[in-house]
């Protein structure tokens, strides 16, 4: 991957969404060179919208998202859609990269394509095989920042481990949306989570993120218990200090 600016993706006071539908606001985040961040959140919280806003495919509602100097982004979904289904793997690599058959076989071997696999038409490949192919092409295209939306969907364990190994070895920057917590724990050194219209930043892997969430939940529970105690005490004091009704005298 080519060298790029230290600040790869920059978000400043960013609000994302569509029209009146705000998905997240007040986002101030910077992804630096070599960092691998995973974007988490429940369905519909705006993960893909954030990716598309960063890539300039969706306009921000407020603020801005910038891509650093000399940053070359490889977007998994786009490359996936651009594959020519009629070409064989060998044709694709010879035409697009000018590789010899020997070099093509060696590159594809690293992604678990062996023997006659090189003569398969791209359209006949399984979802997992296509995912491995796209990852290889992104790196060959010179991308130094990979943006991946659910890259391990439809992958078997072996294919997933191959993708994990490729991303771990990749010396550029990665931003990935994934529901696969094992995959996220293997590759991410930073977690961004969209929740309650905010993007929270955890500087560590998935295990670290879980620990932090647990601590936050415990703190919240403690705070709630303390507030409840204060409320009960205040109520007690109010009752104690309330003027007592004077019994009427019976003549």
Named regions from a protein language model:
Residues 3-251:
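ABC ATP-binding cassette signature C-motif
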């Amino acid at each position: 991957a080519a060298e790029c600016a230290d600040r790869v993706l920059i978000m400043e006071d960013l609000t994302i969404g569509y029209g009146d539908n705000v998905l997240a606001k007040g986002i101030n985040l910077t992804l630096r060179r070599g960092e691998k961040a995973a974007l988490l959140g429940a369905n519909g919280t705006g993960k893909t919208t954030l990716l598309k806003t960063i890539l300039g495919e969706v306009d921000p509602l407020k603020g801005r998202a910038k891509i650093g100097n000399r940053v070359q982004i490889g977007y998994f979904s786009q490359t996936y859609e651009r594959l020519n289904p009629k070409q064989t793997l060998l044709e694709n690599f010879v035409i697009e990269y000018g590789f010899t058959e020997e070099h093509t076989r060696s590159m594809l071997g690293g992604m678990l394509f062996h023997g006659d696999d090189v003569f398969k038409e791209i359209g006949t490949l399984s979802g997992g095989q296509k995912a491995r192919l796209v990852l290889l092409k992104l790196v060959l295209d010179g991308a130094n920042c990979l943006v991946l939306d659910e890259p391990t969907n439809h992958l078997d364990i072996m294919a997933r481990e191959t993708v994990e190994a490729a991303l771990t070895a990749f010396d550029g920057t990665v931003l990935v949306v994934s529901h696969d917590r094992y995959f996220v724990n293997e590759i991410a050194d930073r977690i961004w989570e969209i929740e309650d219209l905010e993007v929270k930043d955890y500087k560590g892997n998935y295990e670290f993120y879980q620990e932090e969430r647990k601590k936050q939940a415990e703190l919240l529970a403690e705070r709630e218990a303390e507030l409840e105690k204060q409320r009960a005490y205040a109520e007690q004091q109010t009752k104690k200090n309330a003027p007592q009704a004077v019994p009427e005298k019976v003549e």
